[in-house]
From Swiss-Prot:
Sites of N6-acetyllysine modification: 123
Purpose of the protein: Small heat shock protein which functions as a molecular chaperone probably maintaining denatured proteins in a folding-competent state. Plays a role in stress resistance and actin organization. Through its molecular chaperone activity may regulate numerous biological processes including the phosphorylation and the axonal transport of neurofilament proteins.
Organism lineage string: Eukaryota, Metazoa, Chordata, Craniata, Vertebrata
InterPro entries (alphabetical): A-crystallin/Hsp20_dom (IPR002068), ACD_HspB1 (IPR037876), Alpha-crystallin/sHSP_animal (IPR001436), HSP20-like_chaperone (IPR008978)
Name of the protein described by the UniProt record: Heat shock protein beta-1
Assembly notes: Homooligomer. Homodimer; becomes monomeric upon activation. Heterooligomer; with HSPB6. Associates with alpha- and beta-tubulin. Interacts with TGFB1I1. Interacts with CRYAB. Interacts with HSPB8. Interacts with HSPBAP1.
Annotated phenotype, changing residue 141 to Q: In HMND3; decreased thermal stability; changed protein structure; no effect on homooligomerization; changed heterooligomerization with HSPB6; slightly decreased function in chaperone-mediated protein folding
Record annotation: effect of changing residue 82 to D: Mimicks phosphorylation state, leading to dreased ability to act as molecular chaperones
Length: 205
């Protein structure tokens, strides 16, 4: 089967900034596609768990102005706990996958289908920040339900950075339990054979 690249519609505005929720003094990446740092008390909690990301102490500016920093870090925590998480919805009419890719630019995402599988790829080219050089990539694969036409797969990217890939489910033929039985008319000649036919002719004379 040939490979097909799925174009996605861009719902983000021209002023979209992938770093809008990042703390201005720190732009580090972790294992969940690249995320901002967390407050000290959250860092201690996550450091004692199985959290895979890198964390560091709260910046001094945030300590001096906790009321200002709290909303930004609250949004950051929400994104960090959900970033990279995908959701699959399968109804009678549609099959849909939603994937959080809010830290990838549109030109860093690729969606394609091959052999009944949807493949989503994101890649950051190597870039430099105040901490050094960083690059990041990911690949997610999803098997299409049986009967789904790969050419009908579409995708869109929301302003919040959610990539949605969906396809219509095949329509099943409507089966009815009602059966109409035709009625066949048979004459006496057919019922009695040749002798019955002669008897009918004699009676007619």
């Amino acid at each position: 089967m040939t490979e097909r690249r799925v174009p996605f519609s861009l719902l983000r505005g021209p002023s979209w900034d992938p770093f809008r929720d990042w703390y201005p003094h720190s732009r580090l990446f972790d294992q969940a596609f690249g995320l901002p740092r967390l407050p000290e008390e959250w860092s201690q909690w996550l450091g004692g768990s199985s959290w895979p990301g890198y964390v560091r102490p709260l910046p001094p500016a945030a300590i001096e102005s906790p009321a200002v920093a709290a909303p930004a870090y609250s949004r950051a925590l929400s994104r960090q706990l959900s970033s990279g998480v995908s959701e699959i919805r399968h109804t009678a009419d549609r099959w849909r996958v939603s994937l959080d890719v809010n830290h990838f630019a549109p030109d860093e995402l690729t969606v394609k289908t091959k052999d009944g599988v949807v493949e989503i790829t994101g890649k950051h080219e190597e870039r430099q920040d105040e901490h050094g050089y960083i690059s990041r990539c990911f690949t997610r694969k999803y098997t299409l339900p049986p009967g789904v036409d790969p050419t009908q797969v579409s995708s869109s990217l929301s302003p919040e950075g959610t990539l949605t890939v969906e396809a219509p489910m095949p329509k099943l033929a409507t089966q009815s339990n009602e059966i109409t039985i035709p009625v066949t008319f048979e004459s006496r000649a057919q019922l009695g054979g040749p002798e019955a036919a002669k008897s009918d002719e004699t009676a007619a004379k």
